[in-house]
Amino acid sequence: MIFVSHFIYHEEKTAKAMVEGVDLLESILGKELFLKEVEVIKTDRGSEFSDAEGLEKDNDGSMRTHVFYCDPMASCQKGSLENNHKEIRYICPKETNLKVLGFDSQKKANLMVSHINSQPKENLKGKSPLEMMEFLNPALYKRFMEFGIKKIENDEIILKPYLLKEDN
C-alpha cells in the first residue's frame, strides 16, 4: 500500500547506510510494529544491499525481517514497488543529480513520500495509500505522521521535480 523504499533519506548508497536506514525505520515504528509490518524486504542485488545479516538482524542479533533478492531484470518479482519507482521518477527523473533537484534531506524525502502517497489510486478505488493506511492500520499511520509524513490535499499534490525546490 504505502511504500517505504525511499522513505529513509541516505547521504550515500552503501551497505552501512542501508542498515542504518532499516535501524531508523525500526526506531520510528517501534519493535512490535516493525516486526508486524516489515516481515520482508525485497530488493535487487546492488552492493548497498550486500549486508543481508545487518538488514535482517537488529542490534542485539535478533531476527527482525527477511531479505529476498530479486532476479536481475525481473521487475515482476517486486510487485507494486516498480509502480512506486515510476512515481518517484516523475519527481526525480533518472540520471538527474538529486542534490541539484533539491533532494538533500529527510524532510525532502518525507515531502516526496507525502505527495506520492496522498494521490488517489485506481486500484484502491479512488483512495490514497495514506487514506487506506489510516483506515487499515491507524498505529502505523500515526507513526508515519509523527515522523513527518502528511496527507496532501488532492489539488495540492505535485509530482514534478520542482516539488523539491519549494520551501515545504
Placement of each model-derived feature along the sequence:
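Metal-centered catalytic cores of metalloenzymes
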Residues: 1, 13, 22-25, 89-90, ...
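Mobile genetic element proteins and their domesticated derivatives, centered on retroelements
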Residues: 3, 22, 41-44, 78, ...
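Polytopic alpha-helical membrane proteins, predominantly small-molecule transporters/carriers
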Residues: 4-8, 70
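Active-site beta-loop-alpha junctions of metal-dependent nucleic acid enzymes
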Residues: 7-32
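Acidic/histidine-rich, metal-coordinating catalytic segments
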Residues: 32-51, 71-73
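Loop/turn elements at helix/coil->beta-strand transitions in domains of secreted/extracellular proteins
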Residues: 36-37, 63-65
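Short amphipathic alpha-helical segments
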Residues: 53-55
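Charged alpha-helix within mobile-element recombinases
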Residues: 57-58, 64-153, 159, 163-167
